[in-house]
Every structure is written in structure tokens, then in C-alpha cells.
Amino acid sequence: MDSQGKKVVVCDNGTGFVKCGYAGSNFPEHIFPALVGRPIIRSTAKVGNIEIKDLMVGDEASELRSMLEVNYPMENGIVRNWDDMKHLWDYTFGPEKLNIDSRNCKILLTEPPMNPTKNREKIIEVMFETYQFSGVYIAIQAVLTLYAQGLLTGVVVDSGDGVTHICPVYEGFSLPHLTRRLDIAGRDITRYLIKLLLLRGYAFNHSADFETVRMMKEKLCYVGYNIEQEQKLALETTVLVESYTLPDGRVIKVGGERFGAPEALFQPHLINVEGVGVAELLFNTIQAADIDTRAEFYKHIVLSGGSTMYPGLPSRLERELKQLYLERVLKGDVDKLSKFKIRIEDPPRRKHMVFLGGAVLADIMKDKDNFWMTREEYQEKGTRVLEKLGVTVR
């Protein structure tokens, strides 16, 4: 709470999950899937102890997903369906989750870097007009990740469910001209895993199977350190084969798909996306930075978001960066490679890093009036109140 007794809420609206809670806390109060479902057939009124409603949100929708047509209001970090997004926020602020009176609260929201201004304007409009929060702040996710890690300078590789960003931050300011965006993230890897499983003869084609495959991905997938070696193992042996039990009791076997699906992060052409993979994008970003800041950036690469949780990802990233540096900067001179210092930080709680950073920032700033956009300012200026965010508060 701030000095006037107003609650300060932190809400990290991801493409796949909503993480919400309060300023100063060190873990989200609630984490639930960002999905909205509508029943396909109204044959039963109850399943177990959950009542089937015309509109199901979050955890409830996830549990009953086999009976629902499920929609994700956000795609690639951007709100695509505002009506469903409002249902998601109603659920977040309502009795099921935070149970707050939004008129007496301030809220810190997060957004991906390079988010369209239109999207931000609409968020502000909904927060002030529909929910009537007394103060709102929208923070850039990458900056919050660094705050949570106790850094002011570094490069954040943030890969969630909808979008992957590589965002250099210098002295607490994100550098938009160097920020790179890769529209491959968790959801695309899940889709690709569905495709690979189809080639093995397993069909997952209902909208609800998507969640099932996502859970399988989180349990079994990893990033291969040496892809040729992994492929050889997959073809010639059964060491990679794991059994997985589906919700309906069937057991399926998964092998080379375990490293094949996340490989799309490093080789986008596998899923028909143009451009370079995450390692080369990271290398290009740092090399495009001012020469005096490059060494700092290489030493402070911070991973963030659920799609960086694959075992093997940090070491693969480091291997590819060293390889690229050797080829393109040192022109193949191996002796000089020992001077090249690189450090990839993979904090264990990186799945919720953005929320944690938001909780820290909101707590520090809870009584600073020039930090928050207020309801009065919004009534006076409309969406021009966003100019207040143009200045990064340090």
C-alpha cells in the first residue's frame, strides 16, 4: 500500500499467462493461463465441481478445455481481441483472483518493447474508463527483468509465449533503436511440436489439445548443444525416447521431437519464418551497439521468460555467440578468443522475472506522484497522458 492506503497492483499480462500480485511481493499472487473459453455443447451443467458457464476464463477454462472453444486474447504480445481481454481483466481484478476495488488502487502494467502506440492508448483507456484505477504506469518488460536481477545495464533475451525480444538496456534506459523482435516464442514451438508429432502419427487438432501439447513440451523438450550429434542419436538409438501419459490415459512416445521443436528458436526457417535465429540476432544486436558498451553487454546477457527455461539453452547460446564472434570479429583467429568475455545469466525464477521487477519498481515508486499517470490527468488530457511515460524515471 502507498501512504494514502491505496493498494498497488502489479499485473504482467503475458500472451500465455497472466502474472498478478502486489508491489513489494516476491512472487506473483496468481498465475493463470490467459485464455477465454466458450462451451461447444451445453450438454452438462457441471463437470466435477466446476459449473460450465457461457464464458470460462483462466484456470477454469484450462481445466475444462476439452469441452470449450478456447481463444487467446493476445497474440505476439499485442492484444488482438479487446472484448476477451476485458473478460480476462474482469477475472483478474474480480473475486476469483485479486478481488480489489480498482477505484482505490494503482496498477503497474507491463508491455513488450516496440509495442504499437495504439495498443498502449487502448490499455490506458480501459484502465481509466472501465476500471477507474487512480493511477497507472506501463513499464517495458526488459527493463523490469534487469531491475529484478539488480542490474541497470545489460541485454535481456526475453522469450515468452507470444514473442521473443532482445533488448539492450543502458543505465536503466531501454534502447529502442537496438531492440530486436523475433516473432517466434513458446506458442510457435508448441505449434511446431504438434506438427512434428503429427509426422509420428499422433494427431492433436482440437483447440484444447494445444494446452496438452504445451504441458508435454514443458516437461520433455530441451535445446540440443550439438544438433548433428542429437540427430544422430535420435536416428540410431532410442536413448532420447520418453513416454508421456496424456490426460485421457493414452501413452505416447516422444523422441527427436524433444530437441527438434525448440530448434525453431535458433533456425526460424524450420517453421517458415524469415530471418536469423535468436543467437545470431543477439550477436547482431550487441555488435550494433556503441563499441564502448559492447563488452558490458556481452558480460550481462540476462535470460527471461518461460521459453528460456529449456535445459541446454544457455550453453547453446554461449556456444553460438562464441562461434559467430570468432568468425565475424576475430576472422577465425582462435588465439584471441580467450580474451572474449561472455556471461549468460539464467536466474532460476526467470519465468516470473518481469513480475518481480515490476513489484520492485512499483514498491519504490508507490508514493512518487510524478511517476504515475493519474485519473485526473487522463480526464484532462485523454491518451496524451502517455507523454508522461516518455521520460524514464530513475
From Swiss-Prot:
Binding site for ATP: G160, D161, G162, R214, M215, M216, K217, E218, G305, G306, S307, T308, M309, Y310
Location of the protein in the cell: Cytoplasm, Cytoskeleton; Cell projection; Nucleus
Pfam families the record matches: Actin
GO cellular component: Arp2/3 protein complex; cell cortex; cell projection; cytoplasm; nucleus; site of double-strand break
SMART domains xrefs: ACTIN
Keyword field: Actin-binding, ATP-binding, Cell projection, Cytoplasm, Cytoskeleton, Nucleotide-binding, Nucleus
A GO BP entry: positive regulation of transcription by RNA polymerase II
Self-association state and partner proteins as the record states: Component of the Arp2/3 complex composed of actr2/arp2, actr3/arp3, arpc1b, arpc2, arpc3, arpc4 and arpc5.
Homology family: Belongs to the actin family. ARP2 subfamily.
Free-text function comment from the UniProt entry: ATP-binding component of the Arp2/3 complex, a multiprotein complex that mediates actin polymerization upon stimulation by nucleation-promoting factor (NPF). The Arp2/3 complex mediates the formation of branched actin networks in the cytoplasm, providing the force for cell motility. Seems to contact the pointed end of the daughter actin filament. In addition to its role in the cytoplasmic cytoskeleton, the Arp2/3 complex also promotes actin polymerization in the nucleus, thereby regulating gene transcription and repair of damaged DNA.
Protein name (database record): Actin-related protein 2-A
Gene name of this polypeptide: actr2a
